[in-house]
Amino acid sequence: KYLFEDIYDFAGKIREVNIAKGNFRFAPLMYLCSALENIDKMPQSSFDEIIEKYVEMNVAHPFREGNGRSTRIWLDLMLKKEIGYVVDWSKVDKEDYLLAMERSPIKDIEIKFLLKNALTDHVNDREIYMKGIDHSYYYEGYYVFKMENLTDIKD
């Protein structure tokens, strides 16, 4: 909710409609709650388990808007907590990432390969974090400004 509360009145609320992006239909509303319960129960103690959980959350797409951006942050938080790494998103090509995510419900080897090759142990590096946010918006088609150019952000 915090990420999008100033933009969408439905921010942080589980969606109440079926949604699709392009030709991909996300989890039907009638199965969404059980899908989220199953995701919550999934293990997350290894890189592979974390990515499998991330893929399932992408398929669930619990919100009407902001799923990709918020789940990439969620992914990094899980990786940081469980295995001591985060993704350096500046090393992940947009087209490769989007294609791998589109195919990931069938075969997750591509997304695992892409993300594993972009892992860094600089988990507390603010620059990597901010570049990750920039890339997250870039993946979604936003190009307005870079986080590093904002001067009024406080630690």
Named regions from a protein language model:
Residues 1-155:
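FIC/Doc superfamily catalytic core
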